[in-house]
Each structure stands twice: as C-alpha cells, then as structure tokens.
C-alpha cells in the first residue's frame, strides 16, 4: 500500500487536479476520492492536501488539510498576502481605490505589501504624489518602489514573495504582469496568456492557477479583488478594516466615527494622527454601504 504524501493544489484540468509534492516539488496529476462528490466536498487551488501516489505516476487525493482562508472570484485557498500595485499616472490610482483594496485585504485577514510601480516614468509632480501616498500609508503597510523597466525594487519585492502564496491586486494597467516578468522571467509566457484571458471580458469564468517562483513561493495567475465589491460588509463592521482606528478612544463603545460626539477617531483626524483622505474614504464607504442596506 502506498504511503500518503502531502502537496499543494496548483491547477485543475477538467476533473483532475495537479498537486505539487511539498517535499520533492514533483507535479502529480490526481483524481479525487469518491467521497468528495458524495459529500459535496470542495477543493480549490491553494489547498494543501494528502494524496496517495500510484504505480502509474498519477495519484488520488484523500483529504484536504486545514484551510486558513478562501478568496472568491477567483476561488483560491490559503493566500498569505496581497501585493497591491499602485501607480500615480497611466493610470492614476486614487486613495479611494487604494483604501477599497485595503478594506478587502483586511476583511480577508491578509497581509498587504504596497508597491508603487512605474517609478521610472515619474516627473517631479508625480514624485510629489508618491511622497504624499507614503505619508499616508508608510506607517500602516510596507511599501516597495519598483520599476519593471529598470529593475528598481525588484530584489526587495522578491524578499516579500519568497515562500508565500501571493495574489496581485491593482487597477488594470498598473503593470502587474510586467512586474511578474521582471521578478521571474520564466513566468513570461504564462503571464501573457493570463493577460489575454483577462482581457476577453469581465464575465469570462476563469479558473485560477498557482505560478511558482524560481526562488520559492507562488503567485495566483488571476488578480485578486478584481471587482472591488464591498457590499457584503455591514456598515458597522467597516471600521474594523481601517487598522489605525482600532486604538482610538470614543465616548460610545459602538461609535461608528461618523456623526457621534466625543469620537476619538475624528479627534485623531483633526490632530493629524489619521490622514484626512483615509477618514473621508471611510465615511464615503460607510454611507455607500448604509445606502445599499436601505434599498
């Protein structure tokens, strides 16, 4: 009887699953035990599994190990972090868009690394915008400044990617694919295929895959949080996803930091401890969510 081994699901092929063995790195095409269908058990890219290899070089997945998280659209399990790629022109990423991405990452309990990309294209006015963004976010999230063209920041970014499952996020055109090519040129063909796949239309159903970095770690081939949808968040829950709000003392324990008196968050905004843009974006999202609930 073959001994069970452990691996990670990296892709699907019809009703078969490709598993990468955690010790050898070998990729095994596996089928699922009947119990998955009978018990309606789901399996996703990123799942860590136990499988039994057979004499033909294939295998059978026996169990899915503990899943720490599950992202949707696309479904990917056990993601460690979001690499949020931001540009200040071509296209410009507003602080509102940045904060929406960050809310989704916080809701999913994911670490975030902010990447200011296309640094080689910026003039002095653009660099001023970069410095303003740094002032807002540098105490909240790690920031890496990059250029796929010059190689700036690529080695630093690799250190964040090493040994983790990452998903890239950011507006279309910020250079996610180009960054991946610069980080790991061996991904180039696959990344270009993914770019074409994504451009076929937002309603195209795609199955995510994990692309492996030569230096260790994986990246999901489909950007995370592509539709920036926050409608499943309750208005009263939103404050939990602005990390700098957490230690502020308010008179009311259930303060939403909007129109309540004696609010520690509003006081912190007035004192310059919390960036005005962060607070304004919070209030805008709060009323958006409140409006949807009333419909």
Swiss-Prot record:
CDD domains: S1_YloQ_GTPase (cd04466), YjeQ_EngC (cd01854)
Key words, A-Z: Cytoplasm, GTP-binding, Hydrolase, Metal-binding, Nucleotide-binding, Ribosome biogenesis, RNA-binding, rRNA-binding, Zinc
Annotated binding of Zn(2+), by residue: 250, 255, 257, 263
Binding positions (GTP): 117-120, 170-178
GO biological process: ribosomal small subunit biogenesis
SUPFAM superfamilies, alphabetized: Nucleic acid-binding proteins, P-loop containing nucleoside triphosphate hydrolases
Subunit-level organization: Monomer. Associates with 30S ribosomal subunit, binds 16S rRNA.
Family: Belongs to the TRAFAC class YlqF/YawG GTPase family. RsgA subfamily.
Record's protein name: Small ribosomal subunit biogenesis GTPase RsgA
Species this chain originates from: Thermotoga petrophila (strain ATCC BAA-488 / DSM 13995 / JCM 10881 / RKU-1)
């Amino acid at each position: 009887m073959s001994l069970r081994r452990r691996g990670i699901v990296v892709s699907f092929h019809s009703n078969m699953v490709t598993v990468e063995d955690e010790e050898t790195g070998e990729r095994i095409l596996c089928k699922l035990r009947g119990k998955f269908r009978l018990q309606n058990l789901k399996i996703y890219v990123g799942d860590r599994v136990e499988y039994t290899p057979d004499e033909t070089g294939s295998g059978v997945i026996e169990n899915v190990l503990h899943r720490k998280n599950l992202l949707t659209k696309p479904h990917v399990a056990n993601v460690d972090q979001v690499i949020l790629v931001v540009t200040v022109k071509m296209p410009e990423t507003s602080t509102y868009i940045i904060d929406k991405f960050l809310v989704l990452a916080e809701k999913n309990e994911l670490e975030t690394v902010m990447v200011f990309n296309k640094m080689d294209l910026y003039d002095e006015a653009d660099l001023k915008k970069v410095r303003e963004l740094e002032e807002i976010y540098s105490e909240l999230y790690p920031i890496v400044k990059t250029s796929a063209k010059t190689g700036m920041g690529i080695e630093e970014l690799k250190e964040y990617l090493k040994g983790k499952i990452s998903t890239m996020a950011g507006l279309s055109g910020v250079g996610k694919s180009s960054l991946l090519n610069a980080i790991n040129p061996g991904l180039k063909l696959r990344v270009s295929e993914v770019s074409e796949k994504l451009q076929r239309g937002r309603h195209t159903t795609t199955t995510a895959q994990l692309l492996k970095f030569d230096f260790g770690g994986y990246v999901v081939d489909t950007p995370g949080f592509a539709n920036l949808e926050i409608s499943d968040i309750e208005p009263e829950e939103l404050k939990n996803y602005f990390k700098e709000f957490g230690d502020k003392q308010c008179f009311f324990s259930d303060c939403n930091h909007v129109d309540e008196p004696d609010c520690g968050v509003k006081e912190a905004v007035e004192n310059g401890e919390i960036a005005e843009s962060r607070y304004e974006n919070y209030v805008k999202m709060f009323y958006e969510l409140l409006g949807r609930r009333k419909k």
